[in-house]
């Protein structure tokens, strides 16, 4: 029976190469479409695929055609509706729109539909997070305690009996005995053939036959003296410890839920948190999320309560920072976890509490986190909390802050916080 093995890299997806070429060629238009679609999508399906539309004129290619003007002679088919010099009415609905949309009729030229195609989840996320990096990753790794894990590393000639490899030792024994006795066995085989010939010959050659029997006995004795197993044959399983960088991260989501934070502001904060979570998930194998909501008191809650609880009150931001410090000390050792934090607020805070927030971040949190981002979602002027955080931004490289006014600012602000230039500034 004949077997055909398909070793093509693309398998049945024969057009994958053309698809990848298309994505590379029109990357700018696709990223623009994704950026616009990002602000329209539900927060629950941010990691699914996307239908991307590109204006037809953006993907048009140059082509050769006859120039306008000149004298041409053409022959057209006849008809039974029009005669020479008749005026042809314009079709109903016009053709100057941008395709088959719901726009009004136009009398200016002809329009074309936009080119629409579907991209997969992986393609969507690749384009969404392209040119982004985790800031200060290399600097923090240098002071991180590296864990070591034991891995198999072949075989060694020395070791403890518990690690002996029986199969490999017997293989070495067979190879050694074969190499040491191969010549003697060939010589023994030749002597046995000569003995058989002499034994059947006439007249009998008793002296020669006795000599051959004596040599055969000596060779067999030499072969038997080769030991079946020798210390030279023994092989032991070898193990070595290799550094195993931490592949787990924790993301702290801190949000103000005071009376000034309405549901639309919370939704904008949620979109930012989901972008950060997806971004971390593409870098670390295991990402845990800790939700801390606060007004005058801070509380660790689940995701649903974090975004949709109706509990409100005044605003004391330091309560959330204190709770985060307690959780880090209790559950997330900075030597084993990559700690990230994102804080969302409308900027309102008790005036006397803002300096305390500065002190907690500077002395307790920023020295142990990889990156701390603060987004202020408001259309009003900045208050004391923003001004205190500005001092932190000028002092700590792993602290960043941005201002969000409406939904369209979320994705650009996220890219600004995690652009690769920020990550490589000190490399």
From Swiss-Prot:
Residues 79-110 are annotated as: Disordered. Residues 92-102 have a biased composition (Gly residues). It comes from the Bacteria. InterPro entries: UPF0229 (IPR006698). Residues 79-90 have a biased composition (Basic and acidic residues). Pfam families: DUF444 (PF04285). Belongs to the UPF0229 family. This is UPF0229 protein YeaH. It comes from Shigella boydii serotype 18 (strain CDC 3083-94 / BS512). The lineage of its organism: Bacteria, Pseudomonadati, Pseudomonadota, Gammaproteobacteria, Enterobacterales.
């Amino acid at each position: 029976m004949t077997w055909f093995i398909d070793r093509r890299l693309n398998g049945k997806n024969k057009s994958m190469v053309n698809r990848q070429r298309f994505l590379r060629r029109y990357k700018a238009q696709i990223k623009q479409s994704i950026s616009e679609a990002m602000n329209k999508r539900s927060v629950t399906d941010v990691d699914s695929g996307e239908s991307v539309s590109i204006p037809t004129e953006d993907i048009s290619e140059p082509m050769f055609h006859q120039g306008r003007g000149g004298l041409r002679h053409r022959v057209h088919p006849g008809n039974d509706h029009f005669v020479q010099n008749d005026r042809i009415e314009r079709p109903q609905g016009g053709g100057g729109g941008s395709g088959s949309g719901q726009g009004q009729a136009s009398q200016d030229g002809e329009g074309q539909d936009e080119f629409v195609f579907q991209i997969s989840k992986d393609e969507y996320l690749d384009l969404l997070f392209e040119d982004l990096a985790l800031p200060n990753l290399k600097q923090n790794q240098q002071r991180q305690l590296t864990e070591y894990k034991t891995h198999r590393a072949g075989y060694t000639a020395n070791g403890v009996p518990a690690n002996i490899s029986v199969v490999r030792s017997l293989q070495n024994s067979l190879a050694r005995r074969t190499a040491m006795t191969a010549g003697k066995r060939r010589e023994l085989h030749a002597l046995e053939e000569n003995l058989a010939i002499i034994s059947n010959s006439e007249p009998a050659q008793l002296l020669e036959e006795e000599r051959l029997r004596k040599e055969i006995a000596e060779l067999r004795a030499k072969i038997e003296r080769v030991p079946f197993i020798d210390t030279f044959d023994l092989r032991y399983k070898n193990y070595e410890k290799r550094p195993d960088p931490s592949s787990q991260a924790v993301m702290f989501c801190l949000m103000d839920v005071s009376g000034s934070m309405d549901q639309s502001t919370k939704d904008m904060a949620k979109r930012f948190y989901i972008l950060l979570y997806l971004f971390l998930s593409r870098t670390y194998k295991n990402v845990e999320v800790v939700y801390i909501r606060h007004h005058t008191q801070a509380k660790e809650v689940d995701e649903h309560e974090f975004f949709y609880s109706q509990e409100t009150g005044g605003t004391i931001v330091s309560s959330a920072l204190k709770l985060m410090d307690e959780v880090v000390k209790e559950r997330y050792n900075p030597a084993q976890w990559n700690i990230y934090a994102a804080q969302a607020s409308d900027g309102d805070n008790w005036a006397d509490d803002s300096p305390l927030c500065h002190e907690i971040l500077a002395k307790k949190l920023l020295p142990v986190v990889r990156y701390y981002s603060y987004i202020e979602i408001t259309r009003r002027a900045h208050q004391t909390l923003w001004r205190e955080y500005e001092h932190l931004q000028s002092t700590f490289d792993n602290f960043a802050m941005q201002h969000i006014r409406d939904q369209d600012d979320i994705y650009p602000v996220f890219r600004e916080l995690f652009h690769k230039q920020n990550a490589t500034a000190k490399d």
